[in-house]
Amino acid sequence: AASLPRSCNVSLIDMLRDNMDEECLLKEIKDKRFDLICLSGYSKDIVPIRNLSSKLKKHSPESIIVLGGVQASLMPEATMEFVEPGVDFCFTGDGENSLAKFVTNTECRDFSHDILKGIPGLVFRSNGKIVKNPEELIADLDSIPFPRWDIMPPASYPKSPHGAFFRQFPYAAMYATRGCPFPCTFCA
């Protein structure tokens, strides 16, 4: 959200923070009629992502659903096949700038091959085939904006359940690295 133009009206739904079940999420998605729904996940999340994205698409068929994260980056073509028909597009690699370019270039919902071909790291379907654009690495990771605290205020998160000192402060997990932080060996 931080990389998107400020003119974009962005909502962040954190199901854990808001103690939201799937039924509440689907109702909110249907009621708010989002233009774009962004999901992210690891390889372990791919089955729940497929199931959720299919339900999201049924509740909000006009919404464009995109998927990023480690799973989409490791196996983009297989991921696109697996999450069909719920997910419309995937992003591989560093998605911040690519997502911003996607939003800017498709505001008028022009998803022509020529428009999509110019978006780095985008994976999409064209004429029955899956197309993967080359990724564009972010040369300076310090250029990535900090999170949009206005749409995810730290005080809105529950207090940490861990540690004697930290129990009095709100807690939300945030990754400060690229890629997967876990030491598994089955993905890569």
Where are these regions (language model features)?
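Glycine-rich beta-alpha loop elements in corrinoid/cobalamin-binding modules
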Residues: 3-140
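Radical SAM [4Fe-4S] cluster-binding motif and immediate context
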Residues: 142, 147-188
